[in-house]
């Protein structure tokens, strides 16, 4: 999430909620692993876009949602110097 100003080791504050608006940064659980991504839902497709140009987007069919779940909305972060 470096392109969003969030660096490794920063504390990110999450408001627990099951949905977010397109383009918002969310905590997302993928196969039991947590990650931060920008979420875009278009029809039956969910695209999880990293805010880091070094990584490609992840695309899921909405039928895959048993493996993918939005845990909450990122509402702020603290950068530790």
Model-derived regions, located:
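Acidic/glycine-rich C-terminal interaction modules and beta/coil loop segments
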Residues: 1-81
